[in-house]
Amino acid sequence: MATLFIADLHLCAEEPAITAGFLRFLAGEARKADALYILGDLFEAWIGDDDPNPLHHQMAAAIKAVSDSGVPCYFIHGNRDFLLGKRFARESGMTLLPEEKVLELYGRRVLIMHGDTLCTDDAGYQAFRAKVHKPWLQTLFLALPLFVRKRIAARMRANSKEANSSKSLAIMDVNQNAVVSAMEKHQVQWLIHGHTHRPAVHELIANQQTAFRVVLGAWHTEGSMVKVTADDVELIHFPF
């Protein structure tokens, strides 16, 4: 058996091929797993569990079917869907996890997270993240009418796209010291995350031993998952 990890699908109505590919994944590979972990940015945007978007309900039903089949499903918030709440979690049968979670998998101690907190060189983003994660601000935003939230979210995405276009690729990648610090804090040899859209397996030194950072790819033109078994940790890309 295997435990599966995915991230950065950025599901939206404008990308039906990705949605179709995810549905096939849920109906196939996911049903064979010991567990499925979604490490953030499942959706391109999330403005509240009360959003009647048909795509959200379609995805909730599909994930719930996996959960009901006996495969537990877990979710860590990303930078796009950090407002996804308990209502959607119940509807989809997912368990919400904290932003950093340590798993014991087949004899390995593995830290999982979305990955944006590791990009500490991007000071502008980290300041923005700290602001929008304030509970009082989230409560205020979610109390606004849905049409107002949609306008704010659209403007924020446009501003983010403009800001990122002028940033260097290095700034938007993880900071190596932040990686080592997180792994040593949790005393792990393995780290699995998404966010950067730079799929790879990196070898490093943490806790005075060889350690590994596995980065999930985004679902742009193909699927990406990490498959952990008793024998191996594999980064796998597959057609939709």
Swiss-Prot record:
Amino acids binding Mn(2+) 2: D41, N79, H114, H195
Molecular functions (GO terms): manganese ion binding; UDP-2,3-diacylglucosamine hydrolase activity
Binding-site residues for substrate, renumbered to this chain: N79, R80, D122, S160, N164, K167, H195
UniProt keyword Magnesium, yes or no: no
Catalytic activity: UDP-2-N,3-O-bis[(3R)-3-hydroxytetradecanoyl]-alpha-D-glucosamine + H2O = 2-N,3-O-bis[(3R)-3-hydroxytetradecanoyl]-alpha-D-glucosaminyl 1-phosphate + UMP + 2 H(+)
Family annotation (InterPro entries): Calcineurin-like_PHP_ApaH, LpxH-like, Metallo-depent_PP-like, UDP-diacylglucosamine_Hdrlase
Family the entry assigns: Belongs to the LpxH family.
UniProt name for this protein: UDP-2,3-diacylglucosamine hydrolase
Source species of the chain: Escherichia coli O6:H1 (strain CFT073 / ATCC 700928 / UPEC)
